[in-house]
Amino acid sequence: MEVHELFRYFRMPELIDIRQYVRTLPTNTLMGFGAFAALTTFWYATRPKALKPPCDLSMQSVEVTGTTEGVRRSAVLEDDKLLLYYYDDVRTMYDGFQRGIQVSNDGPCLGSRKPNQPYEWISYKQVAEMAECIGSALIQKGFKPCSEQFIGIFSQNRPEWVTIEQGCFTYSMVVVPLYDTLGTDAITYIVNKAELSVIFADKPEKAKLLLEGVENKLTPCLKIIVIMDSYDNDLVERGQKCGVEIIGLKALEDLGRVNRTKPKPPEPEDLAIICFTSGTTGNPKGAMVTHQNIMNDCSGFIKATESAFIASPEDVLISFLPLAHMFETVVECVMLCHGAKIGFFQGDIRLLMDDLKVLQPTIFPVVPRLLNRMFDRIFGQANTSVKRWLLDFASKRKEAELRSGIVRNNSLWDKLIFHKIQSSLGGKVRLMITGAAPVSATVLTFLRAALGCQFYEGYGQTECTAGCCLSLPGDWTAGHVGAPMPCNYIKLVDVEDMNYQAAKGEGEVCVKGANVFKGYLKDPARTAEALDKDGWLHTGDIGKWLPNGTLKIIDRKKHIFKLAQGEYIAPEKIENIYLRSEAVAQVFVHGESLQAFLIAIVVPDVEILPSWAQKRGFQGSFEELCRNKDINKAILEDMVKLGKNAGLKPFEQVKGIAVHPELFSIDNGLLTPTLKAKRPELRNYFRSQIDELYSTIKI
């Protein structure tokens, strides 16, 4: 049968008939068809496309075959074998920087700025040159090029930190960071524990603090302080009197330049960093982190996000989170091994927004406290009902796209509503990651929509080199911390006294992989508490597996928790101090990971309160006094005074209290038979008072 006969058979017009029909159409109609076709083609070519997820997002982790303990691994992996290195030639921090030199083609590496000035950059090879000079100078001063040689850094984030760090790694030395918030006693402890004989300090004020320890014979091991900024000769003379050499960083570089030593790079198993964690009780613990630990964790991040993101020399990171913590160290390591640029903030968090506008970063790691401030500021500026409605409406439209896996910053809502928010961060951010403490699902979901970039949430701790779980590309839901990273396994173990059972998908989170640290420096007892005989790290966090294979953190094994800014709180220690208040019989200190401060429920002493109040000019029955707001204020002031005298840090002090007239007891279910507080029951019992305190207190 001929083709034209087939057309007739199916009553379909031949091409010649279609042409004749088209000729009869009016010009306006033809133009309309043409415009519609053009718009359809344009939409198809430019329509927003969902990011391709690396695995089935309904099952992001799978159980490891052959295990009976419910061990799970990332579904991104093809089999049960964990990822060790993403790049075969990058196995140490030194290797990573050398790769950065190559892939960047000696491009800009580290940038800094002075007030009201643009960023000034030094190249990768310039950093490598300075690093070799610093390392060579240390060897000239008698320090050994080996992983038993510890070098202290006491500084804010700045280019010199990376240069000094690379100088240490070039010669297999180990970096020991120090930071202000540890306190003087903790710094003294670390200097002695790590036997630091040389410390690099950014400012003369920190050098003076270190000298005080030597002068008071508290840190006799310290012999050299290298200062980055300019300083007076008085400081040199002061150092000479107690046997400490004060030298400028530039002078040290010059010494190394004329005494160059061939690099002696480290092995993957060698120590890279001793990261001291503040903890809650006792002295800081020095987590021993190897080069393999760091590069393995970096590799896990790269593998988990490779379907949607690979860093490049065009990327720019804003460095403001403390380099003394592993989170920022890992982020910067990922950037450097891809030849990206790192721009440092001016050192003043109040100027961060100005730094962002000038630097225009593409990578922006954050902590929940900053996200909360951004969220509050955005909604604070939406000061009319119309503005608030528009903001809510636009965010809901963007959230709908997120649920479809679409991430973009060029929608109508971005142009009308969110452009100003995005511009405040420089306008070029393409990836954000948050960690260190939990973030509110409301805040995270809104900012994911408003900022229009890939926004990941991670979970981990220093002992697993910052991260062990990470949300995956395409899963922009909140309320979980993602799936196990491709570099480690996760399992949950029973916590019987808290009624958490691994068989029900709840229990203490345990981690195993090449990112798990070697132990605590010179502290076998606490190492044994953290690492079991099979190499599992016990985090102390209680987790729950969700149906999609992601992990949700729901509790702490011990009564220790973090506030929104990441500080650890030991409530029982604080309660024992507050119980010294004459008027207080019982106290329950409470904090939440999404709140920046503590509150407390206080039960006054029924026999003491009336006379205590009378001395302060208050009269009434016990119940009346408990309801008196002025009494509430007086009790709080007395507690805070006791806390200050006992050395509580500002974040350990409660900011508000609710006075309750009835004692916690076994009968009302708030105490155990051994008269210990049942904290979950107390939390639930006083939920309304807790919520009211958090809603009314502004700090």
UniProtKB/Swiss-Prot annotation:
Cofactors: Mg(2+)
TM annotation in the entry: 25-45
Keyword Glycoprotein: yes
Location of the protein in the cell: Mitochondrion outer membrane; Peroxisome membrane; Microsome membrane; Endoplasmic reticulum membrane
Cytoplasmic side: 46-699
Membrane association type: Single-pass type III membrane protein
GO CC, alphabetical: endoplasmic reticulum; endoplasmic reticulum membrane; membrane; mitochondrial outer membrane; mitochondrion; peroxisomal membrane
Annotated signal sequence range: none
Pfam families found in the cross-reference section: AMP-binding
Keyword Phosphoprotein attached: yes
One annotated GO biological process: response to oleic acid
InterPro entries in the record: AMP-binding_CS (IPR020845), AMP-dep_synth/lig_dom (IPR000873), ANL_N_sf (IPR042099), LC-FACS_euk (IPR045311)
Function (record text): Catalyzes the conversion of long-chain fatty acids to their active form acyl-CoAs for both synthesis of cellular lipids, and degradation via beta-oxidation. Preferentially uses palmitoleate, oleate and linoleate. Preferentially activates arachidonate than epoxyeicosatrienoic acids (EETs) or hydroxyeicosatrienoic acids (HETEs).
Name the UniProt record assigns to this protein: Long-chain-fatty-acid--CoA ligase 1
